[in-house]
């Protein structure tokens, strides 16, 4: 029985890692042993930051809603409580979009919420 060598398999594995490491600085883009560490760390950062992005955007939406609501004499927590009492189910992403782009529609939502404070 002949010996099974893994030349093609390891070549493809190296090629895959080096392709992922394209654009890295120094030996991280050319040397397999360095590249594999950098690619693994990069994938860890990507995984972590996909979750952090959700957190960051929620904070951004809250800041935008708070700024827009303060122009109408309310604060964010009062506004969100009033929306719940008024049974208006609009998520923060849509509210922030309305606050930035459609002031008239946002103002009407604020007036409806003010009626339930």
UniProtKB/Swiss-Prot annotation:
GO terms for cellular component: ribonucleoprotein complex; ribosome. It comes from the Bacteria. InterPro entries: Ribosomal_bL20, RIBOSOMAL_L20_CS, Ribosomal_protein_bL20_C. Signal peptide: none annotated. GO terms for molecular function: rRNA binding; structural constituent of ribosome. Keywords: Ribonucleoprotein, Ribosomal protein, RNA-binding, rRNA-binding. GO terms for biological process: ribosomal large subunit assembly; translation. Belongs to the bacterial ribosomal protein bL20 family. Binds directly to 23S ribosomal RNA and is necessary for the in vitro assembly process of the 50S ribosomal subunit. It is not involved in the protein synthesizing functions of that subunit. This is Large ribosomal subunit protein bL20.
